[in-house]
Every structure is written in structure tokens, then in C-alpha cells.
Amino acid sequence: REGQKKAAATCKLLGLDGIVSIGGDGSFRGLVELAKQGISVVGVPATIDNDIVCTDYTIGYDTAANTAVEAIDRLRDTMQSHERCSVVEVMGRNAGHLALYVGLATGATAVLVPEKEFNFQRDVVERIRLARLSGKTHFMIIVAEGVGSAVEIGKQIHEALGLDPRVT
């Protein structure tokens, strides 16, 4: 708060009309504090998490989503030829927008997001089992970082199904 007070005083000293900030939730929290001190503020949402309320897409989200999809498309070639399971962790501390989009775009076997508590047996093991029954030999699990450790999820898959997942 001391930093915001100093920033507000500096804005007033310099005679600024206001502050424009490009950023995510941390930047927006700072703007709220400046606004409470009478500074006019404008926030431009820019975060790959796409978690700023009242916005459809934030700057950076589309690039992050497309980069992840391209990387997974390349990874899929190896997965298919070696009949592998991959667990891919994407950004998304408190928001699973990126993981969900990437999972849908790549046809993932399962997508785990922080907004929805998951049951490992039902949401991962059973989906892999059903995919196997339908003839699939490779499986993609997308995990938002806020869900927990992708490495641990990979270990659980190994223990439950005997697969040797690659975690990325």
C-alpha cells in the first residue's frame, strides 16, 4: 500500500491525467488501489490465463493457446508412433481457460482445471480405459498448473494403468 500511495503522490505531483496499465490480475489490483486514492485508471487485460472478468479474450491468450496446440500437435506424432500417454501442463494458476481450450482443440483424453475438483479414477483412469476400448493407443491429459503437479498425475497414471506417461 505504501507503494500505491507513493505512486498516487507522484501522479499528482507530475499532473498526470491518469494511468493506463497493460497486465493481469496483479496489475489490476494495483490500479484499484490507485483509483481509491483518486487517480483515474484504465486497465488493458493482458494475461495468458484469460482470467480477467468481463473480457472475452485477453492479450496473450490466443498466442499462448495456439503455441500450446502447435506443440501438442508435434508431440502427438511421437505419441502415436510409440503408443504413449502424455501429461501436458499448461499455465493456469486459478483459471483453466487455457487448458480447456487446448484440450478441446487437440482432442485430449482428459482435461483437468482448477475450477472443477476432479476424481482421478473417474476423470482420468476411466477416460483412458474407455479410449483404449475404442481402439486408441495414445492418450493426452492436459493439466492446468493450478490443479497440482503434472508429475504426480503421471505417477498416478503409471500406478493405476501401468502406462509410462511422459510429462511435459
Predicted regions and their residues:
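N-terminal glycine-rich phosphate/adenylate-binding segment common to multiple enzyme folds
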Residues: R1-G38
